[in-house]
């Protein structure tokens, strides 16, 4: 025989995600659907209290009493046991509806059916949306990205269950007002994000992307003393030209770092004592051929010191310094990147970290041009956060 009662799971309230100062980044809020079992109510109660309920609903939702009266009468005559009264109510509205005539008699005498749905809200709106993460579907509340996914085992809690009775195909109503097993709420997570810095980073990034009509971009702000990430903004462009928190580019996008790598290249050569900041390098008039491939600067700087070459971000300067020092022994230079673990993942709790790629002699990407290209940030791949982590160590005196 078909079971007429069943323990139906009750979702636990998901833990909150907070910014550094206690501001909410994500919180669980219950939403409520109120439905009506027109078959449970006695004829006398329906006749006496239904018009009062219709009037109360009409006043509260700004519709006519006759609209609700017709709905309730059709539900009664049609033997409907799951008639929708109101959807997606907040808790305040739910309490008001619950106390209206007829419904205040409860599930058996008043036909009240309450469907509680946990929903996730982000008080800061679109700011830090990708960093915080979101669920793939509202039904399963499954999280696959961001902090929501990284700390899901702690945030999700333990579901409870409630005994419900089958009243129609696919429709169930609670047997009593009490739960058989109370859900246990998830733990809260406090992040290092500073909402003021996050807000500034978000709008500064948006302004620059709009100005240059760029495809996407990211901003990460890291505290030097601790390495704590105080802001992480990611914006990608839509087909319509607007921007939104599309992907976590800072964590997931491994690409050629360009001129941001020059400092890293320079630091390795200094550490190896292969170059000196005062030595002279000829950047010529802004172009120089390396093994048949031309490298250019925006303008010529002539003969300048190695320190000045880094200061003016000269492609030719860095390529010349590194190629002259290491063309016969590139492994000496490359070993510093391995020693500094630039070729390995940071090991973040957030999934999807991009894999750094630093080629070595014998690799498919290696050629005579590899060394001068790498000196100014090409022919290798790192994520923005991996580059920033190295810069933060430099700013922190190597720690």
Where are these regions (language model features)?
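Short, small/polar residue-rich loop motifs at catalytic or cofactor-binding pockets
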Residues: 4, 9-13, 213-216
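Beta-lactam-recognizing serine transpeptidase/beta-lactamase-like catalytic domain environment
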Residues: 26, 32, 166-180, 193, ...
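Acidic/histidine-rich, surface-exposed loop or edge segments in extracytoplasmic proteins
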Residues: 28-40, 76-80, 179-189
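Small/polar-residue-rich segments within soluble enzyme cores
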Residues: 51-59, 73-185
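Solvent-exposed, polar/charged alpha-helical surfaces in well-ordered, non-transmembrane soluble domains
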Residues: 32, 48-55, 59, 83, ...
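Juxtamembrane extramembrane loops of integral membrane proteins
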Residues: 8-63
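Soluble periplasmic/extracytoplasmic beta-strand elements of cell-envelope proteins
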Residues: 14-19, 23-37, 84-88, 96, ...
């Amino acid at each position: 025989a078909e079971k007429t009662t069943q323990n139906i799971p009750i979702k636990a309230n998901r833990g909150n995600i907070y910014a550094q100062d206690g501001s909410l980044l994500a919180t669980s809020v219950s939403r409520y659907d109120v439905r009506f079992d027109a078959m449970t109510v006695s004829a006398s109660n329906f006749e006496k209290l239904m018009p009062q309920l219709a009037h109360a609903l009409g006043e509260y939702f700004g519709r006519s009493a006759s609209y609700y009266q017709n709905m309730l009468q059709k539900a009664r005559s049609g033997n409907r046991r799951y008639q929708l009264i109101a959807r997606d109510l907040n808790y305040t509205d739910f309490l008001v509806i619950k106390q209206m005539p007829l419904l205040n008699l409860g599930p058996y005498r008043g036909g009240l059916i309450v469907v509680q749905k946990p929903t996730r809200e982000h008080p800061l709106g679109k700011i830090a949306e990708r960093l915080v993460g979101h669920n793939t579907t509202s039904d399963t509340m499954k999280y696959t990205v961001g902090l929501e996914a990284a700390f899901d085992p702690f945030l999700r809690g333990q579901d409870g269950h409630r005994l419900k009775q089958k009243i129609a195909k696919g429709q169930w109503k609670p047997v009593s007002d009490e739960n058989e097993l109370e859900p246990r709420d998830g733990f809260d997570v406090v992040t290092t994000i500073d909402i003021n810095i996050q807000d500034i980073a978000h709008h500064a990034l948006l302004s620059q992307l709009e100005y240059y009509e760029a495809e996407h971009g990211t901003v990460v702000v890291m505290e030097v003393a601790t390495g704590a990430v105080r802001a992480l903004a990611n914006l990608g462009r839509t087909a319509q030209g607007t921007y939104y928190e599309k992907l976590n580019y800072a964590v997931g996008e491994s690409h050629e770092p360009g001129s941001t790598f020059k400092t890293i290249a320079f630091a390795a050569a200094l550490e190896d004592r292969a170059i000196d900041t005062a030595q002279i390098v000829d950047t010529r008039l802004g172009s120089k051929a390396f093994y048949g491939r031309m490298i250019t600067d925006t303008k010529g700087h002539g003969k300048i010191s190695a320190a000045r070459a880094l200061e003016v971000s000269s492609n030719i300067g860095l390529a010349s310094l590194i190629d002259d020092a290491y063309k016969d022994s590139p492994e000496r230079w490359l070993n510093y990147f391995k020693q500094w673990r630039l070729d390995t993942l940071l090991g973040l709790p957030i999934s999807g970290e991009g894999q750094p790629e630093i080629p070595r002699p014998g690799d498919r990407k290696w050629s005579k041009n590899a060394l001068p290209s790498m000196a100014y940030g090409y022919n290798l791949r790192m994520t923005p956060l991996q580059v920033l982590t190295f810069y933060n160590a430099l700013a922190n005196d190597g720690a």
